Amino acid sequence: MSFLGFDERWAAYLKVAEMNLGGGARVHGGRIAAVHRGAVEVLLVDETGAPDGAAHGAPDGAPVRIDLDIPGHCQDSESWPPVVGDWVGVDDAGHILDILPRRTYLTRPSVGRAALEQPICANIDVVLIVEPVVPAASRGRIERFVALAHASGARPWLVLTKADLANPADLQELGEGCEEVLALDARSAADVARLVELLSGTVVVVGRSGAGKSTLTNTLLGATQTVGTVRESDHKGRHTTTGRQLVCGEHFAVIDTPGVRALGATMDTEAIADTFADIRALATSCHFANCSHGSEPGCAVRDACASGALDADRLERYLRMMAEAERLRSRSNARTARSQDRHASKENTRGRRETMRLKGKNRG
């Protein structure tokens, strides 16, 4: 596998694209490094996964800027436009022919009334959730990020910064549902070296503004981004990453993302259940199979709260996320139905106009 994650499966997709194109034309593999209005930056590779920017006039390892012209077969595709992390096929003329099937896809839910999901990135292996423990780590925010990671198909890892001021036992509790939990100083090369040893593939770094994401990314890559200060009054940082960008390390790629102020729940209720695996396990002992863990008799989850085996606040956060997810799903279904109705109405109108046109011709 190359430094960008190119492997034989991506190569097979490109071979199929070349066969479909015909005429002996070559299809270059490329990974979206950044997205701009009307254009993208693409890191091109050859058939072995080695950098191949020279094919389009860029130094190897440097991205090529490509204008976004929607291919005809992508007009109605749900995968268009490309997002950071996408693998694409590029022809010799420098046009994107297609977006290769995504293995994982991370989206951020809307926090407004509209049930919209904002694409973040694709084909990631690990969602690195960065959360400072000073002044206090937000369990709710961590859980929401973990649920988003599960929904995307990637693995959630938690990195706790400024952790020297916290109780180690408390830190492990914060990482329920995460594959890895690490406490470190984002500015310490020695601390980050422990993380680097574990990383491979593509990692996306997420967290609130001021969490230390850019500092961590800088240390991971040995690069320099603009790192903002954190206000002492409220411990909140200035946004230092204004857009998503994929950058390559020695044996992994990193996607840094802007900080978030508020985070909605995913619509994927299974992903939420995976995040709260302890509650899901308890629920199997509830008297009713469809127990809502409210006022039903024989609720094993409520009994666990009463005995102190389960934190009541954790249950409330779970119920709140599930309720939010159901509301979003309902709004999304309603929007889809309205869109389908509008499309059907337009098709009916076109059909009536065509019928009238043909009738007019026949009369003539």
Report residues per predicted region:
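A general sequence property marking short-to-moderate contiguous segments
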Residues: 1-18
